[in-house]
Amino acid sequence: MMHSRRFRLLRSLCCCALLAGPGLASDAAAAPAPVSSGSAPAKPVYAEWFTDEAMRVDLFHAGSGSAEDYSLDEVVWEPLWPGTRVHLIDPFGFGTWRFRVVDAASSREIFRQGYATLFDEWQGTAEAQAGVSRSMSESVRFPWPRKPVVVHLDKRQRDGSFRPAFSLGVDPSSHQISRARPFASFRTVELNPGPPPDKALDVLIVPEGYAREDEAKLQRDLRRFARVFLEYEPWKSQQAHIRFRGVESFSLESGVSEPRKGLHRDTILGSSFNTFDSERYLTVVHTKRLRQIASLAPYDALFVMVNSGRYGGGGVYNQWSVFVSDNEYDDYVMLHEFGHHIAGLADEYYDSAISNDEDLMYPPGVEP
């Protein structure tokens, strides 16, 4: 990820659009006290606290419409941290959640990033409000710490403040940290020339719903969408600093699940239309496999390219974005969902509600 360049790109985007609204130990806060945003501390120096590698914490986010909790799946080693080495403390403060990495010995905060979750949206649905419990997988990634750390997850409250929800102690020398490399046989494809990962906005496309017999189409689609993306501002004028890669991820079946039509496909990521029974909402609910495949290449931003001609997609801030490959509006959908993913931008239109109670997402007196 580019250092100050990505900062300027995001600042430009967000000023002109509405914002949406042994070694391991964990603790879910039972009755937490609010966490103040506070003033920005002195910037931590990357080389003092982190190596060139990355740490991924895979989590389960579970609950109902009125309660939720996080639990640990596993901590995973990744070979390269491609992200910022300058803005280690998130300067924007966007998202319904944030995670903070704190040095265990000194309690100094050395990394912070905001994010949103699909689970937050589900909590407002009729299903969740009726008391049904569900779980979804999520991950947070950060540079590999040189010393033991504590990872804190804080949830934004209706008034904009944060409240602690979960904490996890991690010793980077622990033998419990997974170093397995699933899907290592999948090939990474370079889609455009660009600078090295620490000086680029690294964008990764993971194909979904492409069977082995679709390989030629997969290759064409990867290159077409990388090219289309760079034809639009603000990315066009910054394309020398943006690097696209793809992963040749194949599914057992072509296409994507469409439950309302009775179509259920066996695909590598298990993506599906009709998320939360919304007609066009296309998402990946369980993202563990997506993260495993994505770890094969450097990435700051993550696309899922779905082999379908039906209109639809989805995007979650600092998580992922999903678009379709063969619709007349596919280029628009790609760019639209990227705005959700990289900058937390809201929809530029509104024609249907996912949440059963819009006040849950946009509290009166707080938003707008």
Predicted ranges, named:
Residues 241-317:
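Active-site-proximal segments of metallohydrolase catalytic domains
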Residues 11-23:
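Bacterial N-terminal signal peptides
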Residues 50-175:
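Beta-strand-enriched, solvent-exposed domains that form extended recognition/catalytic surfaces
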Residues 346-368:
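Post-HExxH zinc-binding segment in Zn-dependent metallohydrolases
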Residues 332-348:
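Active-site recognition of the HExxH zinc-binding catalytic motif
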Residues 2-14:
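Bacterial N-terminal signal peptides that target proteins for export
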Residues 314-335:
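Short pre-active-site segment immediately N-terminal to the catalytic Zn-binding motif
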Residues 176-236, 246-256:
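Fold-level signature of zinc-dependent metallopeptidase catalytic domains
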